[in-house]
Amino acid sequence: MVPLAPGAWLGLLGGGQLGRMFCMAAQSLGYRVAVLDPADESPAGSVADRSLVADYLDSGALAALAGLCGGATTEFENVPSAALEYLARSMRVTPGAASVAIAQDRISEKTFIAGHGFPVGPFAVLRSPDDAKRADPALLPGIVKSARLGYDGKGQIRVATREDVVRAFAAMGAKACVLERLVDLRREVSVVVAREDDGSLVAWPVTENLHRNGILDTSIAPARVAAGLAEQARSIAMALATALDYRGVLCVEFFVAPGDALLVNEIAPRPHNSGHYTIDACVTSQFEQQARVLAGVPMGDTFQHTPAVMVNLLGDLWFQDAGDVPHEPAWLRVLAHPHAKLHLYGKREPRRGRKMGHVTCLGATLDAALATAATIKRELGIPA
């Protein structure tokens, strides 16, 4: 492709915080960004050079985006693949619809991962009540996960018996699900990679992820794992991107089982929450890389120059008095820390469990970054 020079328009499907950070990164390179999202005043739309408020399948809005932009990308995986296919007829689209379609459906995703020989935990597909009734006892205790639209712990139910599986399947609306055996977790880690048209690949350092109530709470980079495990995780992530013939930024999440065995948990065909630290701690952030690949210019260096700990800021912080009236958290306490970088997403309505921002704590050592993160969490009232 002919590279798009700064000044060109880039299109974005999705208006959330990932899109907001993509806009800022692309604009810092000199590109202009048009965002298509159904919501008015979305986080990305509020900072974009142009905001198109319409359904993702609105033909007029898609035509306007295609007429304005030299390429388009997505900020989350549940954009209808039909919208990507429409745009791909007349412009460059990264990632491609086929890759996104695999990641949109947990059954397709698990089948793809296992079918290509990558390590994955035991699972079974549930498509009917009979499948649930005949659930393999070897997969219990386990978790029933909806095939589509599950994220941040949503669409997941823990089960211990076949009767639990039957109830969970019914609670999911009797729609296709995956039953996964519970893994004896040692850690959860992730790797963000980027891949160009010619197959060139880069990867950021492995990140260690700590969750609370199914939502990412803290990411530690680099992960506190053996060098061999980190290299294996990076190799698997890059091999998965190649198997998908992927274009753009991709995150692979892993479970670390006993014996440092890596199991692929899921794929996110986009920048990822666990990669937000790259904005402040790496030569090139995941969002700048997304813009670079879309524009067809050379990828930037992924070197991490500073240890980092990222802490998510959820809407719960606004409701610490146990009431229903939100109160702005004490951001001045965060800004008093010279090695902390505050990022708020411009969301107008705080809600419990909603990602409202993050803070990245930097340090000369990982222990120093961890100490700053612990202090900020304590000052804001975030559980340790």
PLM region spans:
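ATP-binding N-terminal substructure of ATP-dependent carboxylate-amine bond-forming enzymes
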Residues: 1-111, 115, 130, 371
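Short beta-strand micro-motifs enriched in acidic
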Residues: 194-196, 255-257, 345
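Active-site "cap" helix and flanking loop/linker of ATP-utilizing ligase/carboxylase catalytic domains
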Residues: 231-252, 258, 268-320
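Peripheral (often C-terminal) accessory segments that flank ATP-dependent C-N-forming ligase machineries
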Residues: 292-384
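Protein kinase-like catalytic core scaffold
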Residues: 202, 250, 262-266
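Active-site nucleotide/adenylate-binding loops and adjacent lid/helix of ATP-dependent enzymes
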Residues: 102-190, 194-240, 373
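A short linear hydrophobic-aromatic micro-motif
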Residues: 122, 141-143, 175-180, 250-251, ...
